[in-house]
Amino acid sequence: TYSAYDGFFDTLEITPDNPYLPTELQPVMDQVGYLIFTKDALDWHEDGSEYTRETTRVVAGLEWQPSEDHVVEFAVNQGIFEQKSESTSILLDRFYAAMDTVADANGNPVCRSDLDPTAAYPIDYFAWANGYSGGGFYSDRYYTFTPGDGQCQPLNPFGTYAASPEAQDFITERLTNELEVEQFVLNITAVGSFDVLGGLLDGPIGYAAGIEYRDESSDNQLDPLTLGILPAGTSFTPGVQVSEVSPWLFGFTSFDNTQQFNTSGDYDVTDVFAEIRLPIFA
């Protein structure tokens, strides 16, 4: 089994009204009142990571010999490296909402939030430990969709590949990150010799001199969901960072709950050099 998303969810709560509960586990549910479930996420999508890289480089040079003993070289180098990476990630609020499945009036599995948009869903240990719900094991905040709008697709966690394609599509999202690195280099070099002071030196005076200008920049743009930006369809205000809604939360695509940022930078430098050769000794 291959999946780009490899991880596991620990201490997921299965409630007694979950219609996907296997009959073999019903006696345990009747005795305890709930189940604690651990699940690897290997069968929730089959999307691999994709990387597209493109390098463009233009180099030009010119050599000029103003006289027999002097040469001037000019060179310019312009390069751009672009990378686009795509990977699939689980959206935590959607996953927990899809896991919190009940039966509707006709006995069909549905998300609890479709019947009660104010319902709080249970989260697992890792999300709790990293402050997903501000300290509790339940959350009533839906960040990437609006509960009750019919989007939520119930997820069957029991068995390999038990989750329906609709549930897989609902709980996952394709994320795109883009990186661009640009470089510009310009240099001029002159070398030659002067046949002077012949009575004092054992040959002509040689020289080499030059100047180089270098400008480099990079720009790394993360997917808005990776940045914790609330998407269209959220039950809150789209386009704002999730921490403005829940101050304890910075993202909803991983357990880390670490705020991510776009990064960029640039620098330029100018180097000048000069050398001289004096043939003092024969």
Regions found by a protein language model. Give the residues of each.
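Structured alpha-helical segments in the cores of large, soluble enzyme domains
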Residues: L62, D268-F281
